């Protein structure tokens, strides 16, 4: 290559390098200007925030207070239902917990210790001298409630009654040593009925017989009062709050869900009670074996659990199973229900 051509080629290369460097310089200068403007905007924002903070009023602090160490007395309420003492549930059939009259006795003992432990825990905070027991029915297990039931009962209802009233009387007698007063309010369930549905009056029921026998057995225990009458419902006053009690077997389910039926029943019962110049705050039932509560217009709708485990009918046909549970809660004169527990009986 001649010298003249080499000079021309070098000139073209230098020109391309110059153009590339000039482009890069413009590019990086553009990035610099963007970052510079961004930094200026951030600094302006910080200055504006500093200016705004000068006009913000200082935060108002609540005065230091000493928490209350003494509170007004509360009363304890125990929901007691759906024992179905004679029911027989076998683990080999359901794959779940066993249940029979001996298991009922063990779970009753568990309930006894749990009630006392919870009472002592809350007595450190407030006075608890009185215990209310809402017996919501299904204490025994009849033989004519559903088809094939006789094969799932361990003993006849008379033997259930004698054994059951002995155990429950001992339970109440033992609790009476720890409370000034125990008030037991009773309604009947459907599993203790005599005959088929609607054949007899509400109180023609083995639950009613057990309740009356408990009155007689415990008549000499001065601080236990058992309230039994022939109605299927009852309203009980606890610390000025009124509790409507019934078993709950006449409440309809929709798609095996009781919530809608309970809401409708509560609304209708409330209208009926007001027509009788009565009123209540809490709607309390058993029967459905699933412990729950939900808010109502004034108080709550509350459903108790069960002593038994899931039986084959409930688990196989209804696809429903619940742990053995009974409800326990405190009631304060000013606020109604305060603390609450689902007492597990299988632990």
Language-model-detected regions and their locations in the chain:
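Heptad-repeat positions
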Residues: 7, 11-21, 25, 29-32, ...
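Catalytic phosphate/metal-binding cores of nucleic-acid and nucleotide-processing enzymes, i.e., regions
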Residues: 12, 16, 60, 162, ...
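Core catalytic region of metal-dependent phosphoesterases/phosphodiesterases
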Residues: 28, 35, 64-83, 91-217
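Short linear interaction motifs
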Residues: 53-66
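Short, solvent-exposed loop/turn segments at secondary-structure junctions
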Residues: 84-85, 140-141, 191-193, 250-251, ...
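Conserved beta-sheet core of the metallophosphoesterase superfamily
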Residues: 176, 203-232, 238-244, 249-345
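Acidic carboxylate-rich catalytic motifs and surrounding loops in phosphoryl-/glycosyl-chemistry enzymes
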Residues: 182-190, 225-234
């Amino acid at each position: 290559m001649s010298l003249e051509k080499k000079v021309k080629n070098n000139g073209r290369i230098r020109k391309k390098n110059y153009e590339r460097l000039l482009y890069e310089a413009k590019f990086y200068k553009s990035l610099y200007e963007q970052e510079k403007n961004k930094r200026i905007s951030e600094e302006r924002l910080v200055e504006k925030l500093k200016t705004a903070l000068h006009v913000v009023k200082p935060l108002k602090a609540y005065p230091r207070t000493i928490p209350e160490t003494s509170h007004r007395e509360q009363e304890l309420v125990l929901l007691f239902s759906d024992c179905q003492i004679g029911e027989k549930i076998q683990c080999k059939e359901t794959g779940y917990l066993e249940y029979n009259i001996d298991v009922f006795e063990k779970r009753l003992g568990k309930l006894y210790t749990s009630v006392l432990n919870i009472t002592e825990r809350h007595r450190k905070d407030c006075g608890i001298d009185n215990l209310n027991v809402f017996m919501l029915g299904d204490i025994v297990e009849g033989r004519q409630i559903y088809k094939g039931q006789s094969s799932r009962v361990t003993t006849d209802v008379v033997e259930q009654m004698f054994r059951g009233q002995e155990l429950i009387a001992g339970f109440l007698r033992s609790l009476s040593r720890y409370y000034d007063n125990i008030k037991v309010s009773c309604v009947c369930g459907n599993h203790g009925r005599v005959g088929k549905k609607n054949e007899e009056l509400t109180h023609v029921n083995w639950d009613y017989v057990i309740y009356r026998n408990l009155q007689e057995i415990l008549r000499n225990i001065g601080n236990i009062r058992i309230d039994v009458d022939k109605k299927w419902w009852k309203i009980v006053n606890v610390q000025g709050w009124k509790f409507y009690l019934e078993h709950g077997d006449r409440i309809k389910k929709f798609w095996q869900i009781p919530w809608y039926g309970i809401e409708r029943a509560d609304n209708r019962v409330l209208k009926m009670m007001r027509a009788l110049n009565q009123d209540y705050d809490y709607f309390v039932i058993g029967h459905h074996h699933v412990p729950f509560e939900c808010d109502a217009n004034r108080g709550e709708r509350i459903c108790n659990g069960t002593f038994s485990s899931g039986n084959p009918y409930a688990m196989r046909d209804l696809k429903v199973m619940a742990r053995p549970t009974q409800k326990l809660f405190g009631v304060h004169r000013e606020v109604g229900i305060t603390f609450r527990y689902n007492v597990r009986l299988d632990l």
